[in-house]
């Protein structure tokens, strides 16, 4: 009985440790920090402010058509799980 319980515990630990290396979700500050760590050559991006972008005015729906279909790092790694290899592809 003790041996089988030991085997079950070891198998659970192995499964948990291998799951930690798989895909996971990166959102918000964790996503930004992870990308900064993985991609040190990337420049720091300034936070967008409303005043900075207000001068561009209203855009017609035709000019924004392609934007909806694009997938970005947030779509890939926050809304869904991703691996470090996927994150590295954004460097």
Swiss-Prot record:
Coiled coil: none annotated. The gene is SBXB1. InterPro entries: Bombyxin, Bombyxin_B, Insulin-like, Insulin-like_sf, Insulin_CS, Insulin_family. The keyword S-adenosyl-L-methionine does not apply. Belongs to the insulin family. GO terms for molecular function: growth factor activity; hormone activity. Keywords: Cleavage on pair of basic residues, Disulfide bond, Hormone, Secreted, Signal. It holds the Pfam family Insulin. Its main location: secreted. The lineage of its organism: Eukaryota, Metazoa, Ecdysozoa, Arthropoda, Hexapoda. Disulfide bonds join 27-78, 39-91, 77-82. This is Bombyxin B-1 homolog.
């Amino acid at each position: 009985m003790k041996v089988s319980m030991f085997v079950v515990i070891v198998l659970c630990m192995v499964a948990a440790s291998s799951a930690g290396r798989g895909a996971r979700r990166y959102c918000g500050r964790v996503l930004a920090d992870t990308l900064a760590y993985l991609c040190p050559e990337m420049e720091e991006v300034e936070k967008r402010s409303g005043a900075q972008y207000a001068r561009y005015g209203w855009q017609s729906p035709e000019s924004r058509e392609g934007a909806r279909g694009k997938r970005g790092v947030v779509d890939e790694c926050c809304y869904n799980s991703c691996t470090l290899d996927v994150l590295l592809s954004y460097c």
